[in-house]
Structure formats: C-alpha cells, structure tokens
C-alpha cells in the first residue's frame, strides 16, 4: 500500500495552479471557435445577433451560472429547454458551446506544458512510414504469434460526474476551474444520477466534443496509470518497456523506463506498452491484453481490473465486459477486423540423398478477415441493399447530378477497399463492390426513369468500371517494386494503407 501511495504522489506533486484567469482571455475563445467549432478554417467570431464576440459576455455567463436560480432550474428541470432566454444575447447556446470549448483548451494547457518539459535528449525519432494507425498490425503479427491468451476489454465509461472532477484534482489544483466544471456538468445532468442514458450522453457529447474527449482521456489515463503500477508489481523480472505509441506520431525505440505521457489529449486514442510477457493495446474505448502464461494468470488479471474499477472509481463493472480467450482457438474483433492466430498446415518436401519425404508442420499465422455480415448490415442500414445483401436504389440521392451520384458511390467503395486492404481474404470486398456498383446503377436508372439494363446499354458499363477502378491505378503506382495486380483478379497480398487516418471512421463505415 505504501508503494501505491508513493507511486500516486509522484503524479499529485505536479499539480497546476491559476488556470481559471485564462478563461477571461478573449484569444482563448478565438482559438476555441476556430479550432473546435470550425476546424482549422479561420473565421471571424460573430454571434447569432451579428455582434462581435466579447470576453465580457463570457464573464457574465459564468456569473449567471453561479446564480441560484440557474442552478435550481438546471438540476430540478434537466429536460426542459436549457436556453432560458433565447433572445438573451450572452445566454445563447452559442456562448455555452464556446465556453465549453474554451474551458477544454485551458485545462489542456498543464498537460501540454508537461509534454514540452520532456528532456530533449530523449526525443523519439519519427518514422514517416509508420505514422498510420495500421502500423499496429505488423506489431501484432510479430508479437501475437508467440502468445497464448488474450483478454478483450470493454473499458467501462458510465461513471458518476463527480468522479470525473475528482480525477482532475490530481493534476489541476485550481478550485475555481473545478467548480466551473461542476457547474457545466450540472448543466446537462442531475448529480443524483449516473450517465447511463445514452441519449443524454450523446447530446452532451455532440455539444461539447472537446470537453468530452478531455474528460474521457483523463479518466482513461488515470486507469492506465495505475494499471502500469499493477503490472510493475506483478513480475519480478527486469522491466524494459517500450515507449508510447501515439496515433500518427511515431514508433518508439526501446527505452530503459516507461514514462507516462499526456500529449494531445483531445485527439490521440491509441496507446500501448509491452514487456516480454504482456502486451496492451487500447483503441476506441476497448483494450486488448495479451500474454503468455496460464489461464489462471488471466483470471487473476481480470479480478484485478474489476476490483480496481470498483474500489478506485466507485462503480461496478460487469465481469462479462472482459472476455478471456485462447488465441489458437478463437478470434477477436479489432478495429473493424476479425483477427485470429490459427495454426495453418505447411507441407515441406525434404530431400536426403536419394530419399525424399514430406514433412507436415503446423505454423501460426496472424489472420485478419473482413466481417461480411457486419458490413452488409451497415450498407443495409444506409439503404444501399436489403438485409440479405440484395442491392437496391437510394431514392434520397436521385435529386443529385449524375456525377455527384457516381462520386458518392465511388468514394464509399474506395474507402472500404482502403480500410480493409490488409484483409487476408478479399471475397467479401468484391461482394461489397458488387453491391455498391449495382446500387449506383439502380439509383441512376431510377433518376432517369429507366431500367438498369436500358441505362447500362446506353451508358455502357465501361464508365462505371473505369470509375470504380480509378483507385486501382493509383494503387499500382504506389507499389511499383511489387507485383502489380488488379482488384478484379485474385491475389493474397496484404497491404496496409499508410494514409488511412483520413477515413478512420470507417471502422463503423456508414454511421
């Protein structure tokens, strides 16, 4: 217990002060507006009433939030219209959203300072060819072949709002800022309840994207911080951890010690550490814990995690959220793929002098398969096909021009091929390509009030084929040192696109 407290105090000693005054600096909200609401496009900050933005209005909004009438209304009537006075200039939803984004930027400052304070001599070199999230797959192919068990963890998130505030107290000791955060959370939810309503949570997430990401990453980093402590105490072997792997940043070289880092709290979602016995990968609210050893050891780690969430974060997580499987006999859902490590037979001919004989060996192989049923379900939900995969037209797009229709269908088709390009079996991708191509033809035929056969005879199938194979031409130019191939043929090459981050949302392709 003393080791645990000492380990925790190291983080508490780096608390930050005087964050609250920054909330009244106008340039903070200019950054929030440009970066949080309108991406990277610089725009003039103008309200709904066409009045210039002023930090004085933010100050008034904060003062009104502290008034008793507002608090009573937000707590006792959480479901009524939160725009108490829509015509009131400084009480509009626009400024509430700006204040939320500005607050998130301000509280991220201490973590950014911590990143800048890292020693320069330990700067990790960047590898341009490993910047994609898909560079994790070669790592899995290299390491998972030698492991025995895998735990698939759904990181529990429904947590009491007060716990989220308390977690920040370890690193931010600015009482006014923490009070303001409490008022903001009260603004959307009653303190006597949990965030178990998915409708209310998604509403809060939609209006406060940056703040939600910061709170979520704060919670996850706290959980992983003490998970590392448990890992250090669970083995007497010398520990030599790899550094953090952050999405679109770099692979790190072997370091003597593993240090917790908090760079880019708003967007970085992938992180792993490893040692000779255990590997940890986190992505999109899920985590994978793979290791050697016995089944009893994995059960022990499962109990560790359940008790940790219960006694440290004060909420109960169901044991079924942690699945333990043997790698050789099961598959797991990972980033839109069904991955497994099966044993494949390999027949080898051996020649000894005048005698020859065959040796049948079984080799492990990291296999990735496209989930056909899941992807067809997404296409069906988006009204490109029926539930059984039969292509249908998309009436809502018939008002678009022919080129826009072709462009939309073609972009979806190419994105699906991009994201699942590393699959070991391409039959599912060819089926998806057929569904999208025929759905496009039926949509165009419906627009021109014709049949698919008549429309295709008039237009010719060559144009559609050329449109959908445009990406294949780029594909062959990108890999000139390898054997060229066409998507229309059969091949077994597995190529992970290195620019996949731009369409990373295709893990759930059409949502």
From Swiss-Prot:
One of its GO terms (molecular function) is RNA binding. Disulfide bonds: none annotated. GO terms for cellular component: chloroplast. Pfam families: Intron_maturas2 (PF01348), MatK_N (PF01824). InterPro entries: Domain_X, Maturase_MatK, Maturase_MatK_N. It comes from the Eukaryota. Keywords: Chloroplast, mRNA processing, Plastid, RNA-binding, tRNA processing. It is found in: Plastid, Chloroplast. One of its GO terms (biological process) is RNA splicing. Usually encoded in the trnK tRNA gene intron. Probably assists in splicing its own and other chloroplast group II introns. Belongs to the intron maturase 2 family. MatK subfamily. This is Maturase K. It comes from Hordeum bulbosum.
């Amino acid at each position: 217990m003393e080791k645990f407290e000492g380990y925790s105090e190291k983080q508490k000693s780096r608390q930050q002060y005087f964050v609250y005054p920054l909330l009244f600096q106008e340039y903070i909200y200019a950054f929030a507006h440009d970066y949080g609401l309108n991406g990277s496009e610089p725009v003039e900050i103008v309200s709904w009433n066409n009045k210039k933005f002023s930090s004085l209005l933010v100050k008034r909004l904060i003062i009104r939030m502290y008034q008793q009438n507002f608090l009573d209304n937000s707590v006792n009537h959480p479901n009524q219209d939160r725009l108490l006075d829509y015509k009131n200039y400084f009480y509009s939803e626009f400024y509430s959203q700006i204040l939320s984004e500005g607050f998130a930027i301000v509280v991220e400052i201490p973590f950014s300072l911590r990143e800048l304070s890292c020693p320069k001599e330990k700067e990790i070199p960047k590898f341009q060819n490993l910047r994609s999230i898909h560079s994790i797959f070669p790592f899995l192919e290299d390491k998972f072949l030698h492991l025995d068990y895998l735990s698939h963890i759904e990181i529990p998130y429904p947590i009491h709002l007060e716990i989220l505030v308390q977690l920040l107290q370890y690193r931010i000791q600015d009482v006014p800022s923490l009070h303001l955060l409490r008022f903001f959370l009260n603004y959307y939810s009653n303190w006597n309840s949990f965030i178990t309503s998915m409708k209310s949570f998604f509403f809060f997430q939609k209006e406060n994207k940056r703040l939600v990401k910061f709170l979520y990453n704060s919670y996850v980093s706290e959980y992983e911080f003490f998970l590392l402590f448990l890992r250090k105490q669970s083995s007497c072997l010398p520990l030599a951890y790899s550094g953090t792997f952050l999405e679109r940043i770099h692979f790190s070289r072997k370091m003597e010690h593993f240090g917790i880092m908090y760079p880019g709290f708003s967007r970085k979602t992938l992180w792993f550490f490893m040692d000779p016995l255990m590997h940890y990968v986190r992505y999109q609210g899920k985590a994978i814990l793979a290791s050697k050893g016995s089944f009893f050891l994995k059960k022990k780690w499962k109990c560790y995690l359940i008790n940790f969430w219960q006694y440290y974060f004060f909420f109960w997580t169901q044991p079924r959220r942690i699945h333990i499987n043997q790698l050789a006999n099961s598959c797991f859902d990972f980033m839109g793929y069904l991955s497994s490590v099966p044993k494949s037979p390999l027949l080898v001919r051996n020649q000894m002098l005048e005698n020859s004989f065959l040796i049948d060996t079984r080799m492990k192989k990291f296999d990735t398969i496209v989930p056909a049923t899941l992807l067809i379900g997404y296409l069906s939900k988006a009204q490109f096909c029926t539930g059984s995969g039969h292509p249908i037209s998309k009436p809502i797009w018939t008002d678009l021009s022919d080129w826009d229709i072709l462009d939309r269908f073609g972009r979806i088709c190419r994105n699906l091929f991009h994201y699942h390009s590393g699959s070991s079996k391409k039959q599912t991708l060819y089926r998806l390509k057929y569904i999208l191509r025929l759905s496009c033809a039926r949509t165009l035929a419906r627009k021109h009030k014709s049949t698919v056969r008549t429309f295709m005879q008039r237009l010719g199938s060559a144009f559609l084929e050329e449109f959908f194979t445009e990406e294949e031409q780029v594909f062959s130019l990108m890999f000139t040192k390898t054997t060229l191939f066409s998507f229309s043929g059969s091949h077994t090459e597995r190529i992970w696109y290195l620019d996949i981050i731009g369409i990373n949302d295709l893990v759930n392709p059409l949502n």
